[in-house]
């Protein structure tokens, strides 16, 4: 039997989800855990040529956090030496479809880097993990029957909130700062944004799509488009950029239906009031007309919501203040610290 060290020790096996690791672990919890005596480190698995000997030497006795994905050889090593490690937590922000696995049954191994392979590796990570940590209630419900211990960890507020002096200016910015994964969602609003910008000369639209901007969005009046940036650069941008209105469309057939409400925190950090799709994760978070607006998929509802925020600026300013109060309430980083502090033990959960 492996003799575990008495000093709590976390190792994050980092694959390709640095932003996920930072949001849900490093930024809200690392400094405090280290101050309390817990050893915390990030092992970037793709930067090193895999060596079972090195891996065992580095990982033995540690609590492990795996975010989203991990390479096949690393998973095999953990499977073969599971008794040498402490608690394993698997942090999930995306569930690969079981249909991908079913389609591969009885066929040759899935192609490296393909979605079927990702689905297969995810199932193996579920089997390894003592606890699966999910970022949204949608994922919590979807995984309830797939793992005996599923815990919800909603996103924390990772930066300071601004003053709202920019809302006193005459020119307002309407922002959408989703990644290319949200391309289809914002495309739905192309005619809405063209219409609004045609009728309002005191607003601009900002999209973070750069060279990948779809043609359907390119003729929006007073459009500002910027290239997508790294996770770290985006955090810096959010701390400096000020918007009045943020868009968070999540349409019925969106590929992002398992998303957390991180977009609410991003919009609020930039000083904006959000317009959100009236479905999870926003429908139980936003108080319609108080700290944001909830709308359906009909473009007419998005047009009406934009007109409301642009037309009644005093009410919009009040919503922005309320959104900041809610962000402090639901995004308290101490909640995330307490979550990981309670798990900083080598004792396995099952």
Please annotate each region the language model reported.
Residues 10-37, 155-163, 168-240:
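Conserved catalytic-core segment of nucleotide-activated headgroup transferases in glycan assembly
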Residues 286-289, 293-300, 308-314:
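Conserved acidic donor-binding segment of nucleotide-sugar-dependent glycosyltransferases
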Residues 127-162:
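Donor nucleotide-sugar binding/catalytic pocket of nucleotide-sugar-dependent glycosyltransferases
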Residues 20, 297, 311-344:
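A charged, aromatic-enriched C-terminal amphipathic alpha-helix characteristic of glycosyltransferases
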Residues 184, 232-269, 275-284:
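Nucleotide-sugar-dependent
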Residues 1-67:
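N-terminal pre-catalytic "stem/leader" segment of glycosyltransferase-like enzymes
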Residues 96, 111-131:
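Membrane-proximal helix-turn-helix segments that form the acceptor-binding/catalytic region
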Residues 82-102:
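Active-site proximal beta-strand in glycosyltransferases
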């Amino acid at each position: 039997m492996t003799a575990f060290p008495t000093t709590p020790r976390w190792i994050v096996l980092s694959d390709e989800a640095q932003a996920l690791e930072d949001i849900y672990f490093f930024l809200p919890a690392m400094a405090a855990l280290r101050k309390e005596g817990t050893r915390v480190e990030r092992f970037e698995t793709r930067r090193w040529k895999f060596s079972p000997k090195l891996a065992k030497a580095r990982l033995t006795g540690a609590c492990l956090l795996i975010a989203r994905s991990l390479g096949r050889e690393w998973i095999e090593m953990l499977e073969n030496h599971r008794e040498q490690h402490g608690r394993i937590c698997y942090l999930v922000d995306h569930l690969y479809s079981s249909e991908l696995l079913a389609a591969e049954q009885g066929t040759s191994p899935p192609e490296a880097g393909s979605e079927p392979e990702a689905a297969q590796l995810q199932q193996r990570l579920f089997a390894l993990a003592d606890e699966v940590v999910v970022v949204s209630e949608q994922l919590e419900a979807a995984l309830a029957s797939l793992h005996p211990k599923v815990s919800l960890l909603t996103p924390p507020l990772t930066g300071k909130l601004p003053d709202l002096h920019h809302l006193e200016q005459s020119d307002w910015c309407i922002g959408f700062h989703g990644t290319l994964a949200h391309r289809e969602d914002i495309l739905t609003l192309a005619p809405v944004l063209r219409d609004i910008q045609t009728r309002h000369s005191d607003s601009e639209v900002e999209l973070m799509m750069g060279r990948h901007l779809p043609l359907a969005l390119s003729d929006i009046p007073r459009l500002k488009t910027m290239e997508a940036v790294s996770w770290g650069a985006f955090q810096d941008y959010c701390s400096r950029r000020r918007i009045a209105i943020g868009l968070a469309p999540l349409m019925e057939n969106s590929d992002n239906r398992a998303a957390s409400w991180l977009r609410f925190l991003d919009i609020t950090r930039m000083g904006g009031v959000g317009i959100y799709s009236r479905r999870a994760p926003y429908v139980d978070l936003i108080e319609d007309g108080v700290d944001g607006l909830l709308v359906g998929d009909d473009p007419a509802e998005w047009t009406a919501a934009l007109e409301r925020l642009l037309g009644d600026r005093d009410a919009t300013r009040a919503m922005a203040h309320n959104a900041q109060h809610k962000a402090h309430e639901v995004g308290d980083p101490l909640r995330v610290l307490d979550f990981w502090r309670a798990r900083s033990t080598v004792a396995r959960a099952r």
